[in-house]
């Protein structure tokens, strides 16, 4: 569905994708750091995508988009997890049937908001980005997941002219404006049992705190 007027626009889309033998990430990595994948017999992805824009006046505009989704594996079995005794002696490989679980690295909610202020040659853009919880394996366990995060970035730009140029734009990007502590990725380096106690050696990729980048663009 799509609607557009001079000051407002709206789009929506619904999707459903059913997979046979979908190749998905397992949350593990190889000895050289590559993300490992495997085929899943029965899975699906479905969701709703929304996008909108509002021009409040000649100076102020808002753009936003939102994706709501379900990303599921049916009849999932976690296979071949090593089991050791308390003396580090290997006992067996254990498999556990978990039923319907979430596909790894597939958040259910992703949203973006851009508020743009423009005055003559000056522009300021506030970008908000939200990602809901996502799992670093296919077991839907919160202990092996990336926490939801909401991050804001601010971009400032001023365009002017210099001799022998079409335009010059000086910009300033303030990333992670509110200094949020968050991670965007992770993996299980090793998962095993000691008796009945599960051990997950998890690794995460923390992102930078508030940082500022200056840039200059010259068009001839």
Labelled PLM ranges:
Residues 26-36, 69, 75-90, 131-132, ...:
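Flexible, surface-exposed loop regions and adjacent strand-edge segments
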């Amino acid at each position: 569905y799509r609607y557009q007027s001079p000051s407002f626009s709206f789009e929506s889309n619904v999707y459903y994708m059913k997979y046979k033998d979908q190749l998905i990430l397992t949350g593990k990595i190889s000895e050289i750091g590559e993300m490992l994948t495997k085929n899943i017999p029965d899975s699906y992805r479905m969701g709703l995508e929304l996008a909108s824009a509002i021009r409040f006046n000649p100076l102020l505009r808002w753009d936003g988009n939102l994706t709501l989704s379900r990303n599921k594996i049916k009849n999932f079995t976690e296979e071949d997890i090593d089991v050791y005794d308390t003396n580090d002696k290997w006992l067996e490989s254990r498999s556990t049937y978990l039923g319907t679980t979430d596909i790894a690295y597939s958040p259910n909610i992703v949203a973006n908001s851009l508020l743009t202020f423009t005055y003559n040659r000056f522009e300021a853009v506030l970008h908000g980005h939200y990602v809901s919880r996502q799992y670093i394996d296919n077991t839907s366990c919160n202990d092996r997941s990336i926490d939801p995060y909401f991050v804001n970035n601010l971009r400032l730009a001023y365009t002017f002219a210099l001799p022998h140029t079409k335009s010059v734009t000086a910009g300033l990007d303030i990333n992670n404006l509110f200094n949020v502590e968050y991670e965007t990725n992770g993996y299980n380096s090793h998962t095993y049992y000691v008796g009945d106690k599960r051990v997950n050696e998890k690794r995460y990729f923390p992102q930078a705190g508030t940082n500022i980048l200056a840039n200059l663009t010259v068009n001839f």
